[in-house]
Amino acid sequence: MAPPTKILGLDTQQRMLQRGENCSLKSLVQNECAFNGNDYVCTPFKRLFEQCMVKDGRVLNIEVTNLNTNR
């Protein structure tokens, strides 16, 4: 199970990303599956995260997935 991710508003995310200099973009592909009676039908979707080192040495992951990520 993935560690919990804080949910932040866009303005808060942008402020946090401006402070981080050592950031890299990470992606994760998940599947959303549904059973249609005979088979499972799974649709992959991508999630994007900005992974930044903060001043105290911790790693901060901020999800930056938007509506255009999976188009």
From Swiss-Prot:
InterPro entries in the cross-refs: Mitochondr_Som1 (IPR024645)
Pfam families linked to this entry: Mitochondr_Som1
Subcellular location, record wording: Mitochondrion inner membrane
One GO cellular component term: mitochondrial inner membrane peptidase complex
Keywords from the UniProt entry: Membrane, Mitochondrion, Mitochondrion inner membrane, Transit peptide
Keyword Acetylation carried by entry: no
Main location: mitochondrion
Functional description taken from the UniProt entry: Required for mitochondrial inner membrane peptidase function.
Designated name of the protein: Protein SOM1, mitochondrial
Organism: Kluyveromyces lactis (strain ATCC 8585 / CBS 2359 / DSM 70799 / NBRC 1267 / NRRL Y-1140 / WM37)
Higher taxonomy: Eukaryota, Fungi, Dikarya, Ascomycota, Saccharomycotina
Gene name of this polypeptide: SOM1
